[in-house]
Regions:
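A residue-level signal for conserved active-site and pocket-lining positions in enzyme catalytic cores
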Residues: 51, 174, 308
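Generic detector of well-ordered alpha-helical packing
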Residues: 106, 136, 179-182, 261
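Short glycine-/acidic-enriched loop or helix-start segments at secondary-structure transitions
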Residues: 115, 143, 184-186, 268-269
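Short helix/loop capping segments that flank catalytic or ligand/cofactor-binding pockets
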Residues: 60, 182-185, 267, 376-378
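Rossmann-like AdoMet
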Residues: 2-106, 110-170, 327-330, 336, ...
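A mobile, often basic/glycine-rich helix-loop segment
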Residues: 173-221, 271-281
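Long, Lys/Arg- and hydrophobic-enriched amphipathic alpha-helices
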Residues: 217-389
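A short SAM/SAH-binding and catalytic strip from SAM-dependent methyltransferases
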Residues: 165-192, 234-238, 242, 246-257
Length: 389
């Protein structure tokens, strides 16, 4: 997701190049074929999945640069090393109690977070036995490997890349920075107290919405739980809780550290949030049209952290902490680390973007789900909002 200081919200998005438009049209043709095969329209989560992950064509599967100033958005690790240093401090504390274990990152992006964390762990004398990177994109794997070879040449041989979770259970720490928000979501609208599920159809003017009175049960439960009124439109992420439950069964002991933008359930489904949280990003422009340039733009939705906590509990994980990103980083000595930097302006810039409410500090949350960990986690020593879940 883009951060506030470099994000243009609304307005006209840039026009892609001819080659990029041709690429998008190939994906559009594939999605049109899927819509014709369905006859009644394509469920929105399947449209979103194709737009993001269709092999060779989807946004995350096509190889174009996504991260940083030349991409579509900036993530916290790309701002500078302070974020990864603080995360490394927390990881070291967990390994101190575990005594051994695996460090696994899901969706490592450019590899910057893992590189910063490993450098911090080197200084702290807390390098793990094994490092695993769960990455399905061949292009991103290459970028991660190149970065780690450059920054940790003596350690990279101990890093293994995976395309799926380890088959056996394990102990250790799992990092997931901006992973859940990229999972396809179902979109629904409330009518006469019941959910209408969003489908995508193709008309002469392009893709459009169609609404079906079918439900898997999750939307109905949300309507009942939060008293959602008629004409309320929002999303439900059914895949993120399933992802948490699957990981929870494999993590025999340790901590899952989730960093993402979102809210507790009662804030996510607040009566005033009547159009949900669906957001698209293209060349640092944010807008709400998921049908614009399929395959060229990111499509995201915020995280319902109450649902994540409940999914963790179902697989035996407890919430070991829940905080804003600002609270988490400040608990781990962000300001002291910034003061020690030689470049005061760069340090101030990082602190600003990572902690200010108008930037990433408040919208981004950190949740720790743990099993078999007794010591309180340092990252939640200044602020813990678990009771808000």
């Amino acid at each position: 997701m883009s951060i506030g200081g470099s994000l243009d919200v609304g307005g006209h998005i840039p026009i892609p190049s001819a080659d990029a438009l041709a690429h998008s049209q190939r994906l559009v043709a594939m999605i049109e074929a899927s819509i014709r095969a369905e006859r009644g329209g394509l469920a929105f989560d399947r449209f979103m999945e194709a737009a993001l992950y269709a092999p060779g064509l989807g946004y995350y599967a096509a190889g174009a640069r996504k991260f940083g100033p030349e991409g579509d958005f900036v993530t916290a690790p790309e701002i500078g090393s302070l974020f990864g240093q603080c995360v490394g401090q927390q990881v070291a504390g967990i390994f101190e109690e575990l005594g051994h274990g695996v460090l696994l990152e899901a969706g490592p992006g450019t590899g910057r977070l893992m590189a910063d964390v490993l450098e911090a762990l080197t200084i702290l004398g807390a390098l793990p036995d094994t490092v695993l990177l769960l990455e399905t994109s061949p292009e991103l794997r290459e970028r991660q490997q190149a970065l780690l070879r450059q920054r940790l040449p003596d350690y990279v041989a101990r890093v293994t890349w995976l395309s799926e979770w380890p088959s056996d259970g394990f102990e250790g720490v799992v990092l997931a920075n901006e992973v859940l928000d990229a999972m396809p979501v179902k979109r629904f609208r409330v009518a006469a107290g019941q959910p209408l599920i969003a489908h995508v159809i193709h008309e002469a003017s392009g893709f459009g919405w169609d609404w079906h009175d079918a439900d898997t049960g999750s939307a109905t439960r949300l309507i009942e739980r939060y008293g959602l009124p008629d004409d309320y439109t929002t999303e439900v992420n059914e895949r993120a809780p399933a992802w948490i439950r699957d990981l929870g069964r494999r993590l025999h002991r340790g901590v899952l550290l989730l960093i993402d933008y979102g809210f507790p359930g009662n804030e996510y489904y607040h009566p005033d949030r009547r159009d949900g949280t669906l957001m698209c990003h293209y060349r640092h422009h944010a807008h709400g049209d998921p049908f614009s340039y399929p395959g060229l733009q990111d499509i995201t939705a915020h995280v319902d952290f109450s649902a994540i906590a409940e999914a963790g509990a179902e697989s035996g994980l407890r919430v070991a902490g829940f905080s804003s990103q600002a609270g988490f980083l400040l608990s781990l000595g962000l300001l002291e680390r910034a003061e020690a930097m030689s470049d005061a302006m760069a340090a101030a810039r990082q602190v600003k973007y990572l902690t200010l409410p108008s930037e990433m500090g408040e919208l981004f949350k950190v949740m720790a789900l743990s099993r078999g960990i007794k010591q309180p986690l340092e990252g939640f020593s200044l602020s813990d909002r678990t009771s808000a879940l």
